[in-house]
Amino acid sequence: MGFSLSEEKLAEAMAIFKDLCDRKEIVTSDDLEAMINSEILSAAESRKITLKSFLVQVGEGHGTATITLDDDGREATDAAAGNGPVDAAYRAISRIVGFEPELEDYSIRSVTEDTDAIGEARVALNLAGLKVSGRGASTDIIEASIRAYIDGINRLFRMAALKGVRLYGKNAG
């Protein structure tokens, strides 16, 4: 696959592979590549905000989400409502980090085939002129969407730090 990983990152990749084997009957190289890109490489290049857990509820025309994040060792949980589970999850994450970037684009596609396929979500975010994209992958499209948004938020943190820009909000920086 062409990845060059440290021993620590290789151990993380093996853990992801084992988890994927528990979820899927057949694991392909495309599955593994999508998960490594989502879980390891994206996290290595940005601030460490990671998903600990999520719970969504869906009803006709609305959804709610409770999100728990690890923000550099600090656990934070919040809940929000939206016009679907992804919107609600994004609102809850934004409440935790203290700002809500504009969602300029959102897409999801199947990386692999079958009912237990890996879904890859992509987002394009804009906050005060800082434009980033985020990616996430999972066998659960809600989780893939949440991971993509978190990846985008992490990239906003990194870009803001590189440009010396302070992101606003109670937990922004």
Q: Each predicted region: which residue ranges?
A:
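Terminal or standalone catalytic/regulatory effector modules within metabolic enzymes
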Residues: 1-173
